[in-house]
């Protein structure tokens, strides 16, 4: 799940993964308010794991703004799917296809192992910045 221009890059990654036979998808949110909670919960309810990409970090321990709303939408609509939040573009850094491919690799690992691990993650940090 993501918004804005990152969805275009993510769509390119999804297309490449699908060509390789990987079950991958993208839900691009076109508007944030009013938040389409019921529609999102229904669209995501069949997934085995999902990632929510946030452009901005949040000053809490629960995740970015989009992640919080997606999590709430799933909870209120009684849909349970393992979810992780990725904050990207820290410091104005570009988000690459390779970084987005790693998100899908992480999701495959979550599905295979059943272990969510750290639910709040960062994309594109330099080594030693995690």
Which role does the model predict for each range below?
Residues 54-130:
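Peripheral docking tails and interdomain loops at the edges
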Residues 30-39, 122-130:
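An N-terminal assembly and electron-transfer interface module characteristic of large anaerobic redox
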Residues 1-22, 35-42:
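Redox- and metal-dependent alpha/beta enzyme cores, enriched for Fe-S-associated oxidoreductases
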Residues 6-9, 33-36, 58-60, 91-93:
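Flexible loop/turn segments at secondary-structure boundaries
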Residues 39-60:
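A structural-propensity feature for long, helix-poor, extended segments
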Residues 16-25, 76-80:
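Secondary-structure transition/capping motifs at alpha-helix termini
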């Amino acid at each position: 799940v993501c918004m804005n221009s990152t969805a275009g890059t993510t769509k390119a990654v999804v297309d490449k993964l699908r060509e390789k036979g990987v079950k991958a998808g993208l839900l691009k949110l076109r508007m944030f308010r009013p938040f389409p909670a019921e529609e999102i919960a229904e669209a995501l309810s069949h997934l085995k794991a999902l990632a929510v990409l946030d452009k901005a970090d949040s000053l809490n321990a629960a995740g970015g703004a989009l992640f919080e709303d997606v999590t709430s939408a799933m909870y209120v609509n009684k849909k349970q799917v393992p979810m992780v939040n990725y904050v990207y573009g820290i410091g104005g850094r570009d988000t690459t296809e390779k970084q987005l491919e790693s998100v899908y690799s992480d999701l495959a690992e979550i599905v295979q192992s059943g272990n969510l691990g750290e639910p709040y993650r960062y994309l594109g940090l330099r080594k030693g910045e995690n």
